[in-house]
Amino acid sequence: MKSTLWHNLKLCAHGDPNDTIADAAIAVNGDGTIAWTGRASDVPAGYVHWPREDLRGAWVTPGLVDCHTHLVYGGQRADEFAQRLAGVSYEEIARRGGGIVSTVRATRDASEATLFEQAAARLRPLLAEGVTAIEIKSGYGLELASERRMLRVARQLGERFPVSVYTTFLGAHALPPEYAGRADEYVDEVCERMLPALADEGLVDAVDVFCERIGFTLAQSERVFEAAARRGLPVKMHAEQLSGGGGAALAARYRALSADHLEYLDEAGVAAMRASGTTAVLLPGAYYFIRETKQPPIDLLRRHGVPIALATDHNPGTSPLTSLLLTMNMGCTLFKLTVQEALLGVTRHAAAALGAGDRHGSLAPGRQADFAVWSAATLAELAYWFGRPLCERVVKGGVTVFARDAR
């Protein structure tokens, strides 16, 4: 590609709507990195005569980052949704062979090609909303071959779509049926066989665990973290979603990239996260879908200065959500986040939750030229509208990879 000067734009370079430039320009090198950003009147002489792209006064933000998803899995669970609406309990659905076990079964039965096809359909609407980086977890295979297949598909999505994919091994997501009553033995399998094999194949960027009464205990979670540490892999945790239990504090002790959900997080956990630099990833889609009533402790997170990120938590059981903009709206409406917090939560703070703050979430010299162009008069509209297509163009590595008027 050729070096380009993008001009006639309003710039929110670092995901903060309180830090913008009204008449800005972005100089992008031929290798897809940013050479310079700033006021149009201050363009350095070396870039003035570069070929130009006129954005007609549109807002530009960093490409959005969806930092918590379960995008790869077999099938879907709309039938269970209908059953729950008819009054059937989750426990009864599980007794009938539904719930997470049904997704595990569908994922194990699906070919790699089928998993890719289904995940690609879920990914496309996110890309059309300006997402340029995404995390994808395993965790619906719960045995080596299927977990490998999920992570391979996640890697393939990053190779075949214009998006940076970060993979997370979530073998400790649930207890597979064949290990019923033998949770410690399954954790042995995760730590001693699955994680080493998948890490050796280069399929794992981070390791996650579901620490909860219906998931894995603190002791079991710590074993997974120790196994990750032996491999030099960063960790993250599903913590305090359904009950308090010290999961976030444990995650902080291992300097986790993030602790996610956090509805039942207490002040000790918040303080530990602040001390360790662990990002709080809030998932309002799941909160909404399961009709949760206990909100994450937003005021405590603010008071302690813990960075807040937002993510779709796309998954078939509790958050079949493929819109990061709707996630922003939910974060503001349900959790009372400000527009500033919501936009930072899907840019700079979301990138930090992936350990990728030096690559994504901000537009600065030397970084990838990944940005979204918006049809909006103000940045508040990104969190205000839902169901309205606002993203006009997506640029990845300096190249336009999506344009609404070109579809």
Curated annotation (Swiss-Prot):
Binds 1 zinc or iron ion per subunit. Zn(2+) binds at H68, H70, H238, D313. This is Imidazolonepropionase. Pathway: Amino-acid degradation; L-histidine degradation into L-glutamate; N-formimidoyl-L-glutamate from L-histidine: step 3/3. The keyword Zinc applies. Its EC number is 3.5.2.7. Pfam families: Amidohydro_1. 4-imidazolone-5-propanoate binds at R77, Y140, H173, Q241, T318. GO terms for cellular component: cytoplasm. N-formimidoyl-L-glutamate binds at Y140, N315, G317.
